[in-house]
Amino acid sequence: VSSGLRLDEDREYDSEGPLLELDGVSKHFGQESGLLAGLQFDASEFPPFTVEQERVRAVDDVSIEIRPGETLGLVGESGCGKSTLGRTVLRLLEPTEGDIYFKGENLADLDGEALRQTRSDMQMIFQDPQSSLDPRMKVGQIIEEPMRAHDMLDDEGREARAKELLAKVGLDPRHYNRHPHAFSGGQRQRINLARALSVDPDFVVCDEPVSALDVSIQAQVLNTMERLQREFGLTYLFIAHDLSVIRHISDRVAVMYLGHIVELAGKEELFENPQHPYTRALLESIPVPDPRENGSRGVLEGEVPSPVDPPSGCRFRTRCPHLIAPDAYDWTGEKWPRTRAFMRAVKRRTFEPMPAARIEAEFFDGTPPRGEAGSIVAEAIDLVATDGEADGDEADRWEAATDLLLESFAEESVCARERPAYDLESGDGERFAACHLHR
């Protein structure tokens, strides 16, 4: 640890244990709707009307540990709950359920001065380096603002520290009196870094800190963050959707989907041998800058379900290419993968109406499954085929076919009936994958 910039040399906590621990942390939001939204009538009760507000389950039952000095990368598609989790960790948002332990103390038990002191040990770097800096303030004032809030140093000491931090993040201390508009995006993010470090934190949540920067600038800022981590003994929770950024800076990686952590592993182990289908799909979607690469890269199919009503069991199952066959039916050869593909094509309506024989040829190579599964498939084909005998208009018949297939097959899969959670053998410490393929 370097010399003059540490304000507290005596850190009293067990460095062998986790610096931060989340135990079943959830964050749900009430969904704003119309005046009568959620109104329910029950004549057997008094009063007969009740209002149930829909809840957005942004983060659901997350349990992870972050060790002193490491960088835990948190990756996932936009809207999966990454930023909400980061803000909940810092108690910028209050958790709906669960406990957050920092240096062994439950943050829920802290208030007043104790919480204020703890917050000086936990800082955040925001995504947009422009909107996160007050354009009316000078750079020096911006960096000194957290120190003033926590009554650190006198005016002269704060100015000296701000100038020293400017130098540490790669800026000229003579820029102390400039305003943010005089700086580029990369330079503004360095100012954000200096501000976060001003109160000498142990833990920093980095919320997409380089996503708004040009690729040519990203590596420079990441290298600065790594150097500062070594110099100040920092621990990072690094949130990003760019896997190349995550691979650059992380020690371990947690993959998030629709509020759940679906995989957690050491960086190299996760990138070289992903164990969750969602992780594999993310990695396969990375563009390969190789003109000899003529095969198409993997693309995640289907839409992300609503966090208001997430799927039961595994939340990725509605898009998973490896949805497990329901045990209630006998499957041979490729019959289940073909049935699964047909079910999803009907649900997403990705093919034009056609005769039944052509549907069988395209999806089942002319031989649909037999037995009870075959009867269900035949009924669904009859509903959507142009020569089918089912009654009703076309939209109703497609909806009926979708419901039949999903209720008979998708909802009967173990992927729908049970939430998966498996600790896997690993040569690189802890490894977790929330996938029933590891039963």
Residue ranges and their predicted role:
Residues 38-47, 105-106, 157-174, 283-284:
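Conserved ABC ATPase "signature" region
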Residues 200:
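Conserved catalytic motifs of ABC-family nucleotide-binding domains
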